[in-house]
Each structure stands twice: as C-alpha cells, then as structure tokens.
Amino acid sequence: MKSWVRQGRRLVLVGMLAWVLLFLALLSYFLDARVNEPLTSTGSVLYQHPDTRRLASIQASQLHNTNLGSRPELASTLTATYTRDEPRPSATPEFSLEASQSPDSAPLAIYGGPEGIHQDYLDPQSLAAWSSFGTENIGSQSDPVIQSRERTSQNHGSITRYRGGEEEEEEEEEEERQENEDEDVANGLRNTAARKPGGDSSELEKYYFSKSISVVQRLWRGHVSADMLSPRLQRAMKDYVSANKHQVSYRGRRRPSQSAKELLCEMKAQARLQMVDGTQQPFSSLGWASLVPSLPLEQLHKRPDQGSFKSCAVVTSAGAILRSGLGREIDAHDAVLRFNAAPTEGYERDVGNKTTIRIINSQILANPNHRFNTSSLYKDVVLVAWDPAPYTLDLHKWYASPDYNLFGPYMEHRRAHPDQPFYILHPRYVWRLWDVIQGNTQENIQPNPPSSGFIGILLMMTLCEQVHVYEYIPSMRQSDLCHYHERYYDAACTLGAYHPLLYEKSLIQRINTGPGSDLRRKGRVTLPGFSTVDCDI
C-alpha cells in the first residue's frame, strides 16, 4: 500500500514538472516571437509610412540581388537605405507623413515572393537624390569602418576649429593620415572578404562607405574620377551610358584642363537663359505666346548694366545644412533660390526663410502629393520648372511624352495666377549645360540632364553679381541624411548615379573663388556672376 502511494506521488511530481517545463517553453516561444517581430508589421506606426515600406523592401531584398541581371534602368545597382534617428532641425518641427511622401524617397522597391522578384523602378528624377556610394546596411557601432568614419568627422571638427595660420598644412597632413588609415581598413576588409565564399561584396562595400569622407576631401581639392565610386555605382554609370535614354551624341571638344577663367567664359557663352516662350512649335499653335510671362526672367529685377541682383544664395536641400546656423547669413542676400519641396518653416536657423526663386522638376507639378496648387511653398515666388527632353531637342516628342506631364498643370496655373512669374526652361538650355560638363571632363559622363542644383547655380550666375552656394559641395558636416527635411539616410545622396553630379561639383569647385575654410566649415562656394566676368567676346 505504501509502495503504491509513494509511486503515485512520484507520478504527480513528474506530471507537475512536465507542466512547468511546457509552460516555460510556451512562454519562451511567445516572448521570442514578440522580440523578433519585424518593424514592418502592420501594427507598426513606422511601417505605415510609405517611404519606410520601400526602404524595408529594399533591405529585405538584398539577399536576392545576386539573382538580378544587369538592366538598363539601373535600379538593381542601387543600394539599400536605412533609417536612424530623425533629423533634428533648429526648431525641431514635427515630421508629417506628407513631408516624407516625396517620390524622391527611394530609387526602387524590390519585392520578393513566391512568384519571384518584382521591381518597381522609380523615375530618373527620383534617382537624383539616391545616387552616390554603393552601400549595404551598416552594422553595429563597433564596426571598425564606422569607428574610423566617426574619428575622421571628429578630427576634422577639432582641427578646423583650433588651428591658426597653419590650417592648410595641417589639414593636408590629416587627410593623408586618414587616407592611410582607410587603406589599412580596406586591406583588412579585402582579406576578410577574400576568405568568405562569394568574395568581395558586403565587407568591401563597407570599405567604400567609409571612404566617403576622403572622397569629399578630394572633391574639395578638385580631384575626381569615377574610380572614387564603389564598384556598384561604377557599374550603374556604365549602364546609364549604355542605355542612353535621351539619345545623347556629344561631338564637341574635350578640354578638361581649362583655367578657371576659360571655364567661366565657356559657361557664360553656353548658359544664356532660354525659356519656353511660345514661339516654337508645337507651343505656338497652342497659344503659348500669350500664356507665358511677357517679361523674361533676367529682366524681372534688372538694373542698368548690372545683373538683376548683387548677392544671391543657392540653398541646396542637403542634410548637412542642419545645425549650420546659416539662416541669418542666407537671408542677408538680395535673392535666395531653393529647390523643389524644400521647406523653410521650422528650419529658419539653418536655412533662413527668404525665397525669391524656386526651381521645381516636373514631378512637383504632376504628383498630387506635392499639393502644387495649394501649398504655400509655391506662392509669392518666381517659379522655374524643367523636365528632361531628348538631346535632339525634338519639342513635339517632348510635348507628347514628357517624363512627367508638366504642361497641363503649367497652363492651368498660368491661367489661375497670371501675375505670378512662372517659366519652363527650354531643353536647349539644359543640354547646353550638359555639354559644358562633358566638354570639361575627360571621362564619359552620364548621358542624362544635369541636376537641379547645377541648373540653379548657373541660372543664378546669370542673374546675380555674386553667388554663394550652400552644401552643394559638402562641408565637414557631411551626413548620410539625404535631405534636411526628410527622414531617410543613405550615403548615396552626394555624388550621383543618374545625374553627373560628381563632375558637376568638380566644375563648380574649379571656379570657386572663396577660401577653403568656407567650404570646410560652411559648405559655401563663392562664384562670380557672369556680368562680372570679362571674356572679350
């Protein structure tokens, strides 16, 4: 009897122990499932943001990239982006979903599923902001590449702040030291990559990401080449050259060694403003002569024998302008040019609040998310729109098939607001600027229109006696934040894939008359207006 009771107690204890173990196992399972729940769940507020969905799709697709063949559209050569902490503008405004719904938010979306991989290719203008270095998702802060990059940024800040008359010499020594350090890191990464199956992809990409600081330093010195880009972006450039969407056929001379004065005079001759004025077909038959502004842009504020303005500021949308404190300096100019949907409200301390001219690409007019007809961004300013057109200047083809339909919204806006100066750049003007870039570059550049930034700079050099350009060539504040007003980060927003940004910036640096300290500390380039350049022509 006692033996039976003792055995029963043992069975009860074993059963209780089994239930406890089962409970712990179930608890552990559900806790792990909760911890591992991706940010892209439908319950995540972050994932409700359309840009975040695109970025998550790109990141998730990295494992499939080796299955993607070479495509003319290039999207497969562009890289994943990643989100971090939100940018902190001077007044720390609230970030609205609308502000980040720009079509410029990602180069493409790649979706993997049971039926294979599907890619949504974004338009060329969207690719403008997603262009420089090929990058993977960056790992932890213990990564030697990240630590090296952080040390570089800190060293530049302290060295520039405290050195005196020996500034240039010490900076060159620091740059050389950093380049040697980066090379050591690169050798280690190459060796690591070589030991792994598949070779040189992810670790070597981190190396190219770490080189972004030294690339900017070379840009400060005016030394640029496509070899500075990652292999991924070099392939992208080659594919764009092969695709040649706009049928570009350059037959001009190559003069990469022109002096600053010679380059300025060539720019002055080629960059004569030309707008769609309604005198050419098909616009003349559509009555555009009475639709466009009667006064040319260069005569809006014309003074006798001078440019329209004495001093002008071109404010790019780069994230590096955050925490610059340049707002008051920017607003002190006679005229200020801004781009696309870049706001000023909430960012006044860094970017100012004056806007005289706003250059907008055709997406702004065509995409209802930009609220072109209702947003205050596009009111009480001079508007200049542009859209890529064939290199052959076939206006009939352009009108019938623009990249984005800007013509209908333009006509509607002009009829509703006839007193607001609103122009469309003639394709001849845009492609002449491209000819200048290619003619002064030994390498073959992308056969795509220049960026809005380059167009805006040359436009203001026509209208102003002196032009200050902010953060077109990055300062020591260089950041992975693509735009100061949007919440996405990528190292691929500096030197271009679709637009020939690398070569554009090299040309601007060649004609920069400002001191090197302005470029490093403020990201400011000083350029003479064309009216002040004597070319004897």
From Swiss-Prot:
GO terms (molecular function) for this protein are: beta-galactoside alpha-2,6-sialyltransferase activity
Q: What is this protein called?
A: Beta-galactoside alpha-2,6-sialyltransferase 2
- One GO cellular component term, please give it: Golgi cisterna membrane
Q: Which UniProt keywords apply?
A: Disulfide bond, Glycoprotein, Glycosyltransferase, Golgi apparatus, Membrane, Signal-anchor, Transferase, Transmembrane, Transmembrane helix
Q: Where is the composition biased (Polar residues)?
A: 134-145
Sites carrying sugar chains: 353, 373
Transmembrane domains' residue ranges: 11-31
List the ranges whose topology is Lumenal: 32-537
Where do the segments described as Disordered lie? 83-117, 134-202
Using the UniProt record, name the top-level EC class of this enzyme in a single word: transferase
Q: Which organism is it from?
A: Takifugu rubripes (Japanese pufferfish)
Q: Which cysteines are joined by disulfide bonds?
A: 265-535, 312-464, 482-493
Which InterPro entries does the UniProt record give?
A: Glyco_trans_29 (IPR001675), GT29-like_sf (IPR038578)
Functional summary from the UniProt entry: Transfers sialic acid from the donor of substrate CMP-sialic acid to galactose containing acceptor substrates.
Name its cellular compartments: Golgi apparatus, Golgi stack membrane
Starting at the broadest rank, the lineage of the source organism is: Eukaryota, Metazoa, Chordata, Craniata, Vertebrata
Membrane topology listed for this record: Single-pass type II membrane protein
The entry's family comment says: Belongs to the glycosyltransferase 29 family.
Sequence ranges of Acidic residues compositional bias: 166-185
Membrane topology (Cytoplasmic): 1-10
A GO BP annotation: sialylation
What catalytic reaction does the record list? a beta-D-galactoside + CMP-N-acetyl-beta-neuraminate = an N-acetyl-alpha-neuraminyl-(2->6)-beta-D-galactosyl derivative + CMP + H(+)
